[in-house]
Every structure is written in structure tokens, then in C-alpha cells.
Amino acid sequence: MDRTQKEATVAALNSSLQEAGLIIVTKQSGMTVAEVTDLRRKMRAAGCSFKVTKNRLARIALKGTQFETLDGFFKGPTAIAYSKDPVAAAKVAVDYAKTNDKFQIVGGGLPGLKLDSQGVDALSKLPSLNELRASLLGMIQTPATRIAGVLQAPGGQVARVLAAYAKKDEAA
């Protein structure tokens, strides 16, 4: 890679990291190309990105972002996973680490907060932003559906009584 390619890589990575809500630093030494491709596919499906980068370039790309404190994690063969959703990348990475012992989570970070591997594991157990929105919407809608049910119940009872009288009159 020549200097202009490195500068372009750093600039692209820096702009991606500026928008990220979570970054996870991983070690994946010994993983096959098929395994890395499978991990990338799972990350992409969850709305995340996974990149194997040179440590020096990753450290440079972190400068000027909210994740500058993570530069100590970049030792040895590392890769980064990042996403806008603060939980999505953690869920995929932790699930993948459970099934593949060559893949290890070194640490990660939220904007302004450095996490170790246990912190990333704890973060993966939280509900995602979409799950929180869905449960909040469900909580908001539940009282309205109960009120509608209560209001419809007397009308339904009157209709059933009238139908019973109509059947009784037809039979007589």
C-alpha cells in the first residue's frame, strides 16, 4: 500500500468511526477466510461493519474521534467491528466468539467510554435500540387497547342479548 492509499484508508475509516456508536477490537489469528467472510456476513446483516486493518492505520484513524482511548488495544493481529447501534456489533461479536475459539474480543468502547471484554459481553446482553423502541411502543399501546376493549364490551353484550331474543322469537 502506498502513502496515498494509506491516507485514503485512514480517512475512510476515520469518517466511519466518527458516526459509530460502538467499536469493538478483536483478535482473529488463525481464522480462515471462510470464517472471516461468515463473520462479515453476520455483521452486515445486523447493520455493522467488520474490518481487518493495520494497527498503525487504525490508531491514526481513531485520532479526533470519541474513541481515541482505544489505541492501547491494537497489539498483534487485530480487527475492528463497529456500528451505529450501540448494541448490535456487541451481540454479533459475542455470539460469534462463543462458537469460534479463534475469535477473541479484546475490548471496545462507546463514545467517551473504554470497555474491556467483560464490558462488551455485558453490553451484548442489553436489548438493542429497535427492541427497546418496540417494547416502549407496546407499553404505550397496551392501555389504549384495554380501553377500546372495555368500551366495546357493553356494546357486544347488548348485541348478543338482542340476537338471543331474535332467535327466541323465531323459534316461537
UniProtKB/Swiss-Prot annotation:
Key word Methyltransferase present: no
Keyword Iron: no
CDD domains, alphabetized: Ribosomal_L10
Listed Gene3D superfamilies: 3.30.70.1730, 6.10.250.290
A UniProt-annotated Pfam family: Ribosomal_L10
Keywords: Ribonucleoprotein, Ribosomal protein, RNA-binding, rRNA-binding
GO biological process: translation
UniProt cross-references to InterPro entries, sorted A to Z: Ribosomal_uL10, Ribosomal_uL10-like_sf, Ribosomal_uL10_bac, Ribosomal_uL10_bac_type
Cellular component aspect of the GO annotation: ribonucleoprotein complex; ribosome
Molecular-function GO terms, alphabetical: large ribosomal subunit rRNA binding
NCBIfam families: PRK00099.1-1 (NF000955)
Assembly information from the UniProt record: Part of the ribosomal stalk of the 50S ribosomal subunit. The N-terminus interacts with L11 and the large rRNA to form the base of the stalk. The C-terminus forms an elongated spine to which L12 dimers bind in a sequential fashion forming a multimeric L10(L12)X complex.
Role description: Forms part of the ribosomal stalk, playing a central role in the interaction of the ribosome with GTP-bound translation factors.
Entry similarity comment: Belongs to the universal ribosomal protein uL10 family.
Name this protein carries in UniProt: Large ribosomal subunit protein uL10
Naturally occurring in which organism (per UniProt): Rhodospirillum centenum (strain ATCC 51521 / SW)
Gene name of the encoded protein: rplJ
